[in-house]
């Protein structure tokens, strides 16, 4: 049974680490702003720990799903279904990037 909860599907231990690191002791996983901030915090840690650019949607997604240690071990490589989803997430990100570029928001 996973402890993943809220918009970011953050695990209990990782959420506690986030609150300790950021000092946001009142942050809630059920609050979209807090969950979004958590994701930024986690992705920045992933960049530092795993060397994955913030612009690398595919690998950031894989590391978010598998955890930073799981990603480093390559646990996702045995999960073709997950690799396919990560590709779809990256394609969606590229589509949003193009749309934002056209409307002058990027």
Mark where each language-model region is.
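Catalytic and substrate-binding regions of cell-wall glycan-acting enzymes that process beta-1,4-linked
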Residues: 55-106
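Alpha-helical segment that forms one wall of the substrate-binding/catalytic cleft
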Residues: 5-59, 63-72
